[in-house]
Curated annotation (Swiss-Prot):
Its main location: cytoplasm. The keyword ATP-binding applies. GO terms for biological process: arginyl-tRNA aminoacylation. This is Arginine--tRNA ligase. A motif ('HIGH' region) lies at residues 127-137. Its EC number is 6.1.1.19. Coiled coil: none annotated. It catalyses: tRNA(Arg) + L-arginine + ATP = L-arginyl-tRNA(Arg) + AMP + diphosphate. The gene is argS. The keyword Cell cycle does not apply. Signal peptide: none annotated. It comes from Haloquadratum walsbyi (strain DSM 16790 / HBSQ001). GO terms for cellular component: cytoplasm. Disulfide bonds: none annotated.
């Protein structure tokens, strides 16, 4: 209800300013200062004081007096009253606001906004198919998946794509190495999975190219070039050789994505835009551009008009295209098929992103359709990570460690559980997985993406602090309360519908009203976070929501309330809270356990 309430406040302020013949270009509607017990406030009096030739508090009083809240106006459904404190005009909500919030949040889908009619493609991860997913690249997956989930909650129709580089040098090296080396000459794979099996060939190939004698390296490079040129020429046999490697690796990597509950709707292969001629068509169009130059034996685009010093090379001297050339064709395909495109990129790709955007404009595209948020890297306490030589930390290793540590924590807490149900070994395994994977996802997505992260176990798995387990425990606690009410009272809470929940006047305490305020804010938080592509805002909301729920839990007994109707009212509030926290967790890709 916060969103319609905010609209009412904006209308009220604008109408009052019009009545007073004051400018309405900036209404100043915002969250009030902490010491002001209002839901929204307007600081517009600050801006207008000089033009009104009066002090901000007096201007605020005049504006507040001009707001018409008479019952017969029937303009405002949720504004109860307006007052001022200093220069702030403060807006307070009525009981209908709380009642409609409680009613709306009985829906398990609470927080989903109406359909926007907009189609969006979110491209993320897109790691080269050369081996297992690395921890650093895992941030792309976690951040990108959360952005896609957030946009779906915002009402967009979202497709998740993985752009597969199956045409570059690394794939050429991989294919050559796979065909050259015998499995018996390689170390045992670290896991029984295709990506771990095949990465051995890639690592051995790179070792060979670095350490073999010059003649052997030259011969190998000729074979690698033949593979790359064969792909560029659309040679079917070469394509099939490459796909034998690529498809196996992607199949293995998919297991890591599945562990994170990160879903891809489609893997878009780079060779698609070679084979269908789109990349060649882009080359011909770029050659005819006024800013096209032929320098250093390559066709380039001079981007100085876009304040980009480095030219974009789009065609090599041997007639082969580059990754960005093919990506230009890829993006034009996305523009043709979707209303908007989001590409999640590492911060080391900022120059390429700028070059891509500028060149797309040169090709006549509206790049307002394209957003390219960046993320920084993830480090473990012992330092940075790398993949090419196999010296980095794989995402699977991090998830295994998280689950193992979570299992230890669950075992340690068994004796202090409040609920009298028993946990089987399968329950403990489930909770350990939910908590361990959730800890990794939440700890990564809760940070602003452009800030580097050093992953710390004690923080990520802290059940008592501001972490995923702390928030997950709130959901489990809600489930436990509902189960206890069903088991120990005559109430059938499953029969409580949005039409039969008790009157909101039952819920009068500060803790109850504060929790309802947080529930009411959730859809607006989704809307704001989606507009800025900032899932960390949802993570922050979930954390503060958990704190507010725990205050309610400490101060307001549900099972031992003074009457059955009060129990019914409070359990309705608990269910509304459960739906809110479950969906906040869902947006950031964290499971909501029913027990812990």
């Amino acid at each position: 209800m916060f969103r319609p309430f905010r609209s009412e406040v904006e209308h009220a302020v604008e109408s009052a300013l019009q009545t007073l013949a004051l400018p309405t270009d900036d209404l100043g509607v915002e969250t009030p200062p902490e010491d002001v017990p209002a839901t929204l406030a307007s600081s517009v009096a600050f801006r207008l004081a000089r033009s009104a030739k009066d002090s901000p508090p007096r201007v605020a009083d005049d504006i507040a007096a001009a707001i018409d809240l008479e019952p017969d106006s029937q303009t405002y459904e949720y504004i109860d009253h307006v007052d001022t404190r200093g220069p702030y005009i403060n807006f307070h909500v009525n009981d209908a606001y709380y009642m409609d919030t409680l009613t709306a949040a009985q829906d398990p889908g609470y927080g989903h906004l109406p359909n926007t009619g907009q189609s969006v493609v979110v491209e993320h991860t897109s790691a080269n198919p050369t081996g297992p997913v690395h921890v650093g690249r895992g941030r792309n997956t976690i951040f990108g998946d959360a952005v896609a989930r957030l946009l779906e909650y915002n009402g967009d129709t979202v497709d998740r794509h993985y752009y597969l580089n199956d045409a570059g040098r690394q794939v050429g090296v991989f294919t050559w190495a796979y065909e050259k080396f015998d499995a018996d000459s390689l170390p045992d794979p670290e896991r029984d999975r295709p990506d771990y099996d095949l990465v051995r060939y890639y690592r051995r190939g790179n070792e060979f190219l670095e350490n073999a004698d010059a003649d052997a390296v030259e011969s190998a490079e000729d074979e690698i070039a033949s593979i790359i040129n064969g792909l560029e020429a659309g040679n079917t046999e070469t394509y099939e050789r490459v796909q034998t490697v690529v498809d196996q690796v992607i199949d293995g990597m998919q297991h890591s994505f599945d562990r994170l509950s990160a879903i891809f709707d489609e893997f878009i292969k780079e060779t698609r835009f070679i084979q269908n001629g789109d990349a060649d068509a882009v080359v011909e169009r770029l050659k005819s551009a006024d800013c096209a130059v032929y320098e250093d034996d390559a066709w380039q685009i001079d981007l100085s008009a876009y304040d980009i010093e480095k030219n974009l090379v789009f065609l090599r001297s041997d007639g082969t295209t580059l990754y960005t050339t093919r990506d230009l064709a890829h993006h034009e395909w996305k523009f043709d098929n979707y209303d908007a495109s989001v590409t999640i990129l590492g911060e080391d790709h900022k120059l390429q992103a700028e070059q891509l955007d500028a060149t797309l404009q040169i090709l006549g595209n509206d790049t307002d359709q394209l957003r390219q948020p960046f993320y920084s890297w993830v480090n473990l306490p012992e330092g940075g990570m790398s993949t090419r030589k196999g010296t980095g930390v794989d995402l699977d290793d991090l998830l295994d460690e998280a689950i193992a540590r979570a299992r230890e924590e669950v075992h340690d807490r068994l004796g202090s559980r409040v609920r009298d149900d028993s946990l089987s070994s399968d329950d403990i395994d489930r909770i350990a997985r939910q908590v361990g994977v959730g800890a990794v996802r939440y700890d990564i997505v809760s940070k602003q993406p452009t800030k580097g992260i050093t992953f710390e176990w004690d923080r990520a798995l802290d059940f008592e602090a501001q972490s995923a387990p702390y928030i997950q425990y709130v959901h489990a606690r809600c489930c436990g309360i509902e189960t206890e009410v069903n088991s120990n009272t005559d109430l059938d809470i499953d029969a409580l519908t949005s039409d039969s929940i008790p009157d909101i006047t039952m819920l009068r305490t500060d803790a109850e009203r504060a929790l309802l305020q947080e529930i009411a804010r959730f859809p607006a938080v989704v809307e704001s976070a989606a507009a800025d592509l900032e899932p960390h805002v949802i993570a922050t909301f979930a954390r503060s929501f958990a704190e507010q729920f725990n205050t309610f839990y400490r101060e307001c007994s549900v099972l031992n309330a003074e009457s059955e109707i009060m129990t019914a009212a409070r359990v309705s509030l608990v269910r509304a809270a459960r739906h809110t926290v479950a969906n906040a967790l869902d947006i950031v890709g964290v499971e909501a356990p029913q027990s812990m």
